[in-house]
C-alpha cells in the first residue's frame, strides 16, 4: 500500500484540489460531507462489477480516487486496485483507512495523463467517478483512460449533466437546501452533457456500451439507477 508523490501536471485545478484537501479528514465519516458518496457507492460498485463481468482477479485503476471509498470496495471484491489522485491529504486518509481495514490498495499522487505515459494498456478496468467536472481539460482525462485499459477492457465514467435541472438538483438542492455536500462543491459550468462525453469517447479506442442515470428521491432519501441522464449519469465503455 503505497502513497507516492509526483510532479504537478497542467491538467489540475488547484482550487478544486484545495476544496477536497480541506475536508479530507472526514472522508470516511458516514454522516459527514461525503455521506452521499458512501450512499451511492454500492450502486456504483454493483454497476461496475456487473458490466465488467466481475472484478475478482482483475487489475483496476480508480482515477480521482479521493479518500478511497470506491477503490477499497473494488479491492474487497478481489481486484488488484491502484488509486490515483492529486490531493495529498485525501490519499493519506485513503492509505490509513486501507491499513486499518486490512485492504491492499496502491495509492499514487499523479495525474492520469502522467500515469498513462508509464502504464499504457495495463488495466482490465478503469473507473473515473465524479472527477471529469473537477479538471480543466476533461477530454484529456478520457484520452488517458482509453490509453490505460487493455484491449477488450472496460472504462467507466460518471459525471453531471449540464442543464437547468442538474443545477437545481446538484447545486441548489444538494448544496444549499438539503446540505448534502459542502457549498461550492460543484460549478455548473464544468458539468458535462452526455453528448459531449460521448463525442470525446468516440475520438478514442473506446466504444459506448451502456449509459444509466443515478437518481435521488428526497422524499424517501434513497438513490437508484435507471433511465434518464438529466442529472447524474454513468457511462460504460469498452476498448475496441
Swiss-Prot record:
Q: What is its EC number?
A: 2.1.1.222, 2.1.1.64
Its annotated pathway reads:
Cofactor biosynthesis; ubiquinone biosynthesis
Alphabetical UniProt keywords: Cytoplasm, Methyltransferase, S-adenosyl-L-methionine, Transferase, Ubiquinone biosynthesis
- Molecular functions per Gene Ontology: 2-methoxy-6-polyprenyl-1,4-benzoquinol methyltransferase activity; 2-polyprenyl-6-hydroxyphenol methylase activity; 3-demethylubiquinol 3-O-methyltransferase activity; methyltransferase activity; phosphatidylglycerol binding; polyprenyldihydroxybenzoate methyltransferase activity
Q: Which GO terms describe its biological process?
A: hyperosmotic salinity response; methylation; ubiquinone biosynthetic process
Q: Which residues bind S-adenosyl-L-methionine?
A: 44, 64, 85, 129
Indicate yes or no for the key word S-adenosyl-L-methionine: yes
State where the protein is found. Cytoplasm
* GO CC aspect terms: cytoplasmic side of plasma membrane; cytosol; ubiquinone biosynthesis complex
The record, for Gene3D superfamilies, names: Vaccinia Virus protein VP39
InterPro entries the UniProt entry points to: SAM-dependent_MTases_sf, UbiG_MeTrfase
Q: Which reaction does it catalyse?
A: a 3-demethylubiquinol + S-adenosyl-L-methionine = a ubiquinol + S-adenosyl-L-homocysteine + H(+); a 3-(all-trans-polyprenyl)benzene-1,2-diol + S-adenosyl-L-methionine = a 2-methoxy-6-(all-trans-polyprenyl)phenol + S-adenosyl-L-homocysteine + H(+)
Complexes and interactors = Homodimer. Component of the Ubi complex metabolon, which regroups five ubiquinone biosynthesis proteins (UbiE, UbiF, UbiG, UbiH and UbiI) and two accessory factors (UbiK and the lipid-binding protein UbiJ).
Q: What is the documented function of this protein?
A: O-methyltransferase that catalyzes the 2 O-methylation steps in the ubiquinone biosynthetic pathway.
Q: Which family does it belong to?
A: Belongs to the methyltransferase superfamily. UbiG/COQ3 family.
Q: What is this protein called?
A: Ubiquinone biosynthesis O-methyltransferase
